[in-house]
Amino acid sequence: MLEQRNPAEALTVSVLNSQSQVTNKPLRDSVKQALRNYLSQLDGQDVNDLYELVLAEVEHPMLDMIMQYTRGNQTRAATMLGINRGTLRKKLKKYGMG
């Protein structure tokens, strides 16, 4: 579950720890762990387009949630994301969302 209590706080992910307690940790920690796992599985192989891979993993669900939150209002969604509406439309099309 992703949450942001106020704009000044980092996005957090709720995680169930080994003692069955739910804790919140910054989203960036989860991204780091996912990348660490991915890179450890490469076994020395080269990888291309890692930036695009990571961006797509984050950007697609972010766009989906923002569009749900704004009830499909692209102008409001673009404002929330800090991008212009044309850029938002391109990104929605890229992920088959618009």
UniProtKB/Swiss-Prot annotation:
The keyword Lipid biosynthesis does not apply. The keyword Transcription applies. Residues 74-93 bind DNA. InterPro entries: Fis_DNA-bd (IPR005412), Homeodomain-like_sf (IPR009057), HTH_Fis (IPR002197), Trans_regulatory_Fis (IPR050207). SUPFAM superfamilies: Homeodomain-like. It holds the Pfam family HTH_8. Keywords: Activator, DNA-binding, Transcription, Transcription regulation. GO terms for molecular function: DNA-binding transcription factor activity; sequence-specific DNA binding. Gene3D superfamilies: Homeodomain-like (1.10.10.60). Belongs to the transcriptional regulatory Fis family. Homodimer. HAMAP family: DNA_binding_Fis. Activates ribosomal RNA transcription. Plays a direct role in upstream activation of rRNA promoters. This is DNA-binding protein Fis. It comes from Histophilus somni (strain 2336) (Haemophilus somnus). The lineage of its organism: Bacteria, Pseudomonadati, Pseudomonadota, Gammaproteobacteria, Pasteurellales.
